[in-house]
């Protein structure tokens, strides 16, 4: 009887740990989610650029999903014109550095090519209180006079 109870408790603990791990994975967007959001952002910009940028800045229209959001910059001067990271709105994307001090903004700027989705990798902490740096990947493309991107946190299994 005691053995059966212990087996049930162990099974319950395994399920709880598994559920917690699954919940954490679901709280972050995947590479496929990020690429799909970028593709939707491209369609929105082509349809109505000013409305799209407004939606991106406000996180409306499905353009804020967990830790995923589009950000866009002017090709002419590199200025960020849409982002959920309000501290970089209006700054030059080319000056961005990751938390290790590595400049990655110029890579993002240079990667913005019409009809191509490129990737740039850098180190950034996930949203929340944990300051641990993890690999973040941004998918980037060009839409008219804008460079647009969506970044996701790579799995750290």
Language model regions located:
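N-terminal membrane-sensor/transducer module of prokaryotic signaling receptors
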Residues: 2, 6-157
């Amino acid at each position: 009887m005691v053995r059966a109870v212990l087996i049930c408790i162990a099974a319950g603990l395994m399920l709880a740990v598994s559920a917690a791990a699954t919940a954490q994975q679901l709280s972050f967007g995947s590479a496929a989610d990020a690429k799909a959001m970028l593709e939707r952002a491209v369609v929105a910009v082509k349809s109505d650029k000013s409305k799209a940028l407004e939606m991106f800045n406000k996180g409306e229209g499905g353009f804020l999903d967990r830790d995923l959001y589009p950000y866009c910059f002017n090709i002419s001067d590199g200025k960020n014109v849409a982002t959920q990271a309000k501290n970089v709105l209006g700054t030059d994307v080319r000056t961005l550095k990751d938390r290790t001090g590595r400049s990655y903004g110029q890579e993002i700027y240079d990667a913005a090519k019409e009809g191509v989705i490129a990737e740039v990798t850098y180190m950034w902490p996930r949203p929340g209180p944990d300051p641990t740096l993890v690999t973040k990947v941004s998918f980037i493309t060009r839409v008219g006079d804008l460079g647009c991107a969506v970044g996701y946190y790579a799995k750290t299994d």
